[in-house]
Amino acid sequence: GGINAALGRDDSPEIHAEDTLKSGGCIAGEQSVNGLCSAAPEIIRSLERLGVVFSRDENGEVALRAFGGQSRNRTAYAGASTGKQIMSALIREARKYEASEVIKRLLGRQFYSALIADGACNGALLYNEKTREIETVYAEAVVVATGGQNLLFGKTTGSMQCDGYAAAKLYEQGVQLKNLEFIQYHPTTVETPQKRMLISEAARGEGGRLYYIENGKRIYFMEDRFGKNGNLMPRDVVSKCIYDAPSQVYLDISFLGEKIIKSRLLEVAEVCKNYAGIDVYK
């Protein structure tokens, strides 16, 4: 995977924002998009200070790969373990605040409901998995970040714990909800008996090509329809085209070579081998 930031010499937060709004069908809030894109370069630098080792190019600059819906290469990545490195760095930082008692973590708890009185949220009720009791936590501000509702769609690349309970419970409690139709999903996956295993967009960012077979011939349908960068169209476009394909769709990265795959797409290779018995080097 990776994280987008306008770090290239031919790029800017303004171009980044323009690409983002265009890829989102101009539905996204322009002010929020501008703020996020403007902050992104400093976020990369902050993550570096926290210990994330981003890959470098031949000039020693943060390496940038292509991702869907972008007019510039602007996806920074840390080898084949971007997400893991970012999470590890943030957890280490959080533990510093925990050690100094600035924050307190409550482990083994699940969100049960919001604590609402007189139209205001004053905290939350949590289910203690160990004691099987409901606990009350009071707070001046409450953020419910429980991971969405991917499980409602059956097989998913997301966590099987993301069942939409929190949103449903808050709705029952009279909380106004918006934008529930926007569900994060991924167009390229490997099917397993239990769930879908994600094939990172990085595979297409490094040159992977989508195709189906017709009369014994490979049809590179994304390139046929959208040109040489067709495999890097926004996710909704790629997903619709895969869905409309007349037969099984495949993603070819074998031509990238073992060196590139091991250095940049190792996680993809391991997922395919361990969960589906597929050797991506062939």
Tell what function each PLM region has:
Residues 144-157:
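Flavin (primarily FAD) binding-site architecture
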Residues 158-171, 177:
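Thiamine diphosphate
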Residues 48-133, 138, 145, 189-193:
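Conserved redox-cofactor binding core of oxidoreductases
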Residues 169, 175-281:
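An anion/pyrophosphate-binding glycine-rich loop and adjacent beta-alpha core
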Residues 5-36:
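Glycine-rich active-site loop/strand segments that organize a redox cofactor
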Residues 28-41, 75-92, 106, 156-164, ...:
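Short beta-strand to alpha-helix junction loop
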Residues 2, 39-45, 49-54, 166-173:
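Hydrophobic or amphipathic alpha-helical targeting/insertion segments
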